[in-house]
Amino acid sequence: MSTAIESPSELRIGILLFNWIVAVFLMMSPQARAQVPRSEPTVAGAMVLRVATFNAAMNRKSAGELTEGLQKGDPQAAKIAEILRAVSPDVFLLNEIDYDERSAEVFLNRYLSSQERQDSQEPTEQPPWKYFFAGPVNTGVDSGLDLDGNGKMHEPNDAWGFGTYPGQYGMAVFSRHEIQKEAIRTFQNFRWSRMPGALRPMRSNPGSTELESYYPDAVWDQLRLSSKSHWDVPILIGGKTLHLIASHPTPPVFDGPEDRNGCRNHDEIRLLMDYVAGDSSGAYVVDDNGRTGPLATDASFVIAGDLNSDPIDGDGRAEAIRKLLEHPRLAKSPAPKSLGGVEASENSKGANLKHQADPATDTGDFNDRNPGNLRIDFVLPSANLKVLASGVYWPSKSQSAEANALVGASDHRLVWVDLQWEQLKQ
């Protein structure tokens, strides 16, 4: 973390600049920001619960840099907050917000605070977000092993999850409703080899026609499955509990013919599926406190996150995400869509021209040459929840030129789902 001390004049300038940035975004009309209207419940006494996921791309080059920038005033973070304010989810997961025990709290207090909301003078806005959870992740945590086999240790590829410092590419959950922190289950330390039938990466053996393991046994037995972590975050809403199942699997690229990242991405998604399956397939799961077993069969849950796998296009092992999307424990509903995704695909060249999926379902605006725009961010409710509406926050220029420019704060787009939540009667 940087130890540089700013002069009082530099600090005042930074604060004034930050306040100006926030004021500009708050002065944008709801129409300019393309606010997303909330659905109406179909059952008397029920509430509408909006759940979202958003890879905010708020990762930085060095430890502590994000928090330091947030305290000074960060233009990207102000845009991310404005997107969140336009969609106004009750519960949301942020991927790629660096973890250092302070960043999530600073972002909440300085960019999503009730004071800013009061200043906006928009009576249609929902109550403020009060609760958050941010925990340690595997990215940047040195394994002490030569994981990539290049004869060197202590490099980014030798961390339990790729990263240059602990907490890079972290994640956090924010909520208007109470997070039951004492009941959170995390799976940061779960070992890949503990998964039955794990996709162990293999490579050719120059002295044999048979394949050999890319990772030696001594390394394989220690490898952690989660590139960041997997979380089960219980949230108390109207007397009932919603489990937000959060993760951010590794991209299935940046490797070699052994496809070690593709295998890992597949099994990180499989862990989600096994955990919520409601049968013996998740019996092997053990959390960081030593508690074994999957989620209860009668639980209401939402799987959320940048899963880095498109079911149709891209370079991943699509069978895992396809199985997850088709799982009987998940609600059957159309994929969230946007007009901006269609517009972006029509205006781009390269890989998008060869894609087979509906561009309206894309959730990321990536390199036109490769991989092109993809659907890799998901909000997947359990089958015992009624889906009222869903969408990808990606306004077209014709809908709102201002909002279309705003979403460029990240290469991912926020995905949201409206659920009917029937509260317990008092």
Can you name each region flagged by the protein language model?
Residues 180-242, 281-286:
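A surface/extracellular/periplasmic glyco- and lipid-processing/surface-interacting theme
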Residues 244, 249-251, 259-265:
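Glycine-rich, aromatic-lined ligand/substrate-binding cores of catalytic
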Residues 73-75, 139-140, 162, 204, ...:
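Sequence/structural signature of beta-propeller domains
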Residues 1-14:
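N-terminal secretory signal peptides that target proteins for export/translocation
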Residues 16-28:
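Bacterial N-terminal signal peptides
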Residues 35-36, 178-186, 190-196, 234-236, ...:
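Metal-dependent phosphoester-hydrolase catalytic domains
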Residues 32-173, 200-224, 238-242, 255-257, ...:
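N-terminal, active-site-proximal structural segment of metallo-dependent hydrolase catalytic domains
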Residues 85-89, 97, 102, 106-116, ...:
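Sec-exported extracytoplasmic/periplasmic mature domains
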